[in-house]
């Protein structure tokens, strides 16, 4: 099942889209029945994940935030502080939305064996010259998780993996994410292995 909004969405880099579409076509040539799947809440999955995880993590690290915040990595400091000021109502709503999203994903997996999306809306980034978030825009990207598409399957507690599906014109790798039913890792691995054997991205 192809999660259409994750492949054709405006946030997806054009080269990422092209490579993922080619990978999906390759799976079809290998015998997979390809169909489009709609998961309404998936567009909000990164925001849900941020509210759930940041709130939980800041609670666990409350003493560290109060007494030795500077000992944490700078990016982790930002996450902990964001979680510390998150209203309890927002966290509770995110937990409810997580359960709704999980049910939508499970309903989708009742129709297909696996779900496929890009792993990220952009290719793998070069290593930064220095750690830390250097702008408001970068911080909002981090909070919103606009680049990574792994959040929904983490929230749904279903197995997922990322496999290389090609390289951009700048030789940056692009990931194809394959997710399956709970406790059905074997199917996810079989799909990934079949794709890997039909391509040379892994060599």
Question: What spans do the regions from the language model cover?
Answer:
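Short, Asp-centered acidic motifs that coordinate Mg2+ and/or phosphate
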Residues: 113-115
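Flexible, glycine/charged-enriched surface loops at secondary-structure junctions
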Residues: 29-40
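Structural helix-boundary/capping segments
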Residues: 1-11, 21-30, 92, 103-106, ...
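Short helix-loop capping/hinge segments that flank enzyme active sites or metal/cofactor-binding pockets
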Residues: 1-4, 52-106, 118-122, 159-173
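Short, glycine/charged-enriched secondary-structure capping and boundary segments
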Residues: 15-18, 129-132, 177
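Short glycine-rich, flexible loops that bind phosphorylated cofactors or substrates
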Residues: 9, 123-124
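Acidic helix-start/capping segments at beta-turn-to-alpha-helix junctions
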Residues: 40-51
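Short, surface-exposed loop/helix-turn segments at secondary-structure junctions
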Residues: 52, 92-93, 125-147
């Amino acid at each position: 099942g192809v999660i259409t909004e994750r492949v054709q969405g405006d946030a997806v880099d054009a080269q990422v889209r092209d490579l993922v579409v080619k990978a999906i076509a390759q799976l079809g040539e290998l015998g997979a029945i390809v169909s489009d799947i709609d998961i309404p809440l998936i567009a909000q999955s990164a925001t849900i994940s941020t509210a759930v995880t940041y709130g939980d993590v800041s609670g666990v690290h409350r003493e560290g935030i109060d007494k030795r915040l500077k000992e944490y990595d700078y990016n982790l400091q930002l996450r902990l502080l964001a979680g510390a000021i998150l209203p309890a109502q927002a966290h509770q709503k995110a937990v409810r939305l997580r359960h709704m999203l999980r049910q939508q994903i499970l309903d989708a997996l009742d129709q297909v064996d696996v779900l496929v999306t890009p792993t990220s809306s952009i290719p793998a980034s070069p290593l930064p010259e220095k750690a830390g978030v250097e702008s408001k825009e970068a911080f909002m990207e981090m909070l919103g998780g606009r680049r990574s598409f792994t959040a929904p399957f983490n929230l749904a507690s279903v197995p997922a993996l990322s496999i290389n599906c090609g390289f951009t014109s700048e030789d940056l790798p692009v990931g194809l994410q394959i997710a399956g039913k709970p406790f059905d890792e074997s199917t996810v691995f079989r799909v990934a292995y079949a794709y890997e054997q039909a391509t040379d991205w892994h060599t």
